[in-house]
């Protein structure tokens, strides 16, 4: 007999503990974004395919589930990333504004997981700034990313920063090189294969510089010094390096000292076809993949009639909850007996209004068999009144 309870690979349920943890974190993050002036938007799950794939290169196309609209016959896609949708909202629906700060939290669906054990249905949360080309907008979203990870309580964070314009200007000098393969080998830090691929251009300084990019990795000060040495022959690299220095020297990010270490990684070219400037990735101890990514994607709304500067970040709430699962403690609740006594119901309402969780047992339900909760107090009828028992109230 077919196991009807099985789910597709990379798709999973969230059971009560994890779902409660995720929802609590989602609310805390969105409240934080709101207090920073970011407005919540909720794009639809499905859109016309050409809208979903705007400015994304081929990566997002491969990740997108496609279907045919039974009403119009047009090709639709289930969103694999929310940023193109938010850029459409900024460009078309909120075009009367100057600078937009927008945030979101919703599920996406992907044909393939992002990692070996990753989910194909991440619950993506993020924040984006549209309409400001200065480094200040990048610093604002990086600061908000670090605050988000602090709220998630994942421990110390390493933030790797890059500027995709550096690899771009080197690749532009190597006529005929297979850029996609170069980018893959850079990301994998496969120097032997990269050296072999670049052998026909071995006499060109740009090839040597590309091979040196993986060495421009590590603690910010030493990695930046190495980067300036490697890229010294290219004056056009100076503004990009200065932008990296501006982020590293930001007083706003300095307040995270002790919990965040800043690093440079010029070989991290993930999102090369998507990002147009600064890129960044956040890592936590014991987890190989980045837990948060972001960067600049200027002009993403051009296809919607309004190409603007844009920068932002995203996180996967499922992944954050999985990483903090060992920190989860069952919610403390108050157990009340089943009764229609108005005095008991009024007492329960008062406790709930104060933020307490009160579970009223159904007839015949055994309080000793409550799963997934910590019943640290009970309500009993004591000396003619309904009172809390089991803990000093």
Predicted regions, residues:
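TRNA-binding/sensing appendages of the translation machinery
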Residues: 1-84, 139, 160
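Positively charged, Gly/Ser-enriched RNA/tRNA-binding surfaces
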Residues: 18-36, 48, 83-96, 102-154, ...
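A structural signal for short, well-ordered beta-strand segments and their strand-loop junctions
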Residues: 40-43, 104, 158-162, 263-264
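Beta-rich nucleic-acid/ligand-interaction surfaces
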Residues: 45-61, 162-172, 268-277, 368-372
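Acidic, His- and aromatic-enriched active-site or binding-groove loops in soluble protein domains
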Residues: 63-70, 176-198, 203-206
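Short, basic, helix/turn surface patches
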Residues: 66-78, 187, 382-393
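Cap/lid and interdomain-hinge subdomains that line or gate substrate/regulatory clefts
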Residues: 133, 137-138, 160, 167, ...
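Extended alpha-helical scaffolds
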Residues: 152-159, 164-168, 177-179
